[in-house]
Amino acid sequence: MIKQRTLKQSIKVTGVGLHSGNKVTLTLRPAMPNTGVVYYRTDLNPAVAFPADPNSVRDTMLCTALINDQGVRISTVEHLNAALAGLGIDNIIIEVDAPEIPIMDGSASPFIYLLLDAGIEEQNAAKKFIRIKEYVRVEDGDKWAEFKPYNGFRLDFTIDFDHPAIGKDVRNYEMNFSAQAFVHQISRARTFGFMKDIEYLQSQGLALGGSLDNAIVLDDYRILNEDGLRFKDELVRHKMLDAIGDLYMAGYNIIGDFKAYKSGHGLNNKLLRAVLANQEAWEFVTFEDKEQVPQGYVAPAQVLI
C-alpha cells in the first residue's frame, strides 16, 4: 500500500516576510492521517486555520494568498506548498506568526531541507491521489493552462517575456515529476521580478522584504544578481515550481498531464477549480500494490539528496 506521509517531529525556522519585511517564525508539525495540509496564523487569538483548499485562494495578484470569510489572510504559501507536493507530504500543521510565509531565498529549497531535517514518516493510511480523467482547459486572453489524462505527473510550462536576458531557448521547461526531479531540477529555482515593478511595489508598502538575496531581479537589459542564475532557464523552472505549489492546493498529488502557456497563480487556481468542479474530470485513487503506482510517485521521499 502507498501510505500517507507526515513529519517525524516538529521543526521551526525564522525568516523574513516578502511584503512586510518583518521577521516571521514558521513552525511545521506532524499531523494525524487524513488531516491534510492546514496553515495556522498563530499571531491571532484565537489562532485562525486555513486548510489547503483551492476555493480559499482569493488573491493571486503577487503571490498565492488564502483568505477566509472574515477577510483574514495568509500570503506567499506557494513555495512551501510546492515543497510539500515535491516530497508527497499529505498531513502537516503549518504555524506562522505573521500574515505571510517567510520568503527564505525565494525558492522551495530551504523548505525541502527543513522538511527532510524534521524527517518524513509514513502513516498507516492509504495515500489518496487525484487522477485526471478528462481534458480540462482554462484561458485568459492569450494565456492558458490545461490538464489531460496521463499515468504519471508530467509538466510542460512556457513563459514569454520580451526581455534581452530571457531568450527563446530558456522559455520552456518540461519534466516528468518525481520527488528526485523536483528536488534537483525545480526546488532551487528562485522567484524573479523586474526592478521597475519592485520599485513601484515598495513605494506602495509592498515587497519590503524583497532583495537580491531572495529574488532574481532584472532591469531593462540584464540580470542584476552578481552570482547570476542557478540554471540558465531558472525563470521558467520557477514558474513550474509555482504551478506545482498552486496545484497542490487540492491537498493531493495529481496524476495527469499539465501544460501551460504564460500561466500564473490566478490561472493555475482557475484550472484546479475547473477540474474539481467537474465530477467527470477526475477521481480519487489509492494504490494497494506498489507495482501499479505511476513511476514518479514510487520512490520514498527519504532517499532524495
UniProtKB/Swiss-Prot annotation:
Gene3D superfamilies in UniProt: lpxc deacetylase, domain 1, lpxc deacetylase, domain 2
Gene Ontology molecular function: metal ion binding; UDP-3-O-acyl-N-acetylglucosamine deacetylase activity
EC code: 3.5.1.108
Cofactor(s) in the UniProt record: Zn(2+)
SUPFAM superfamilies in the record: Ribosomal protein S5 domain 2-like (SSF54211)
Top enzyme category: hydrolase
NCBIfam families from the UniProt entry: lpxC (TIGR00325)
Family: Belongs to the LpxC family.
Record-given protein name: UDP-3-O-acyl-N-acetylglucosamine deacetylase
Species this protein is from: Haemophilus influenzae (strain 86-028NP)
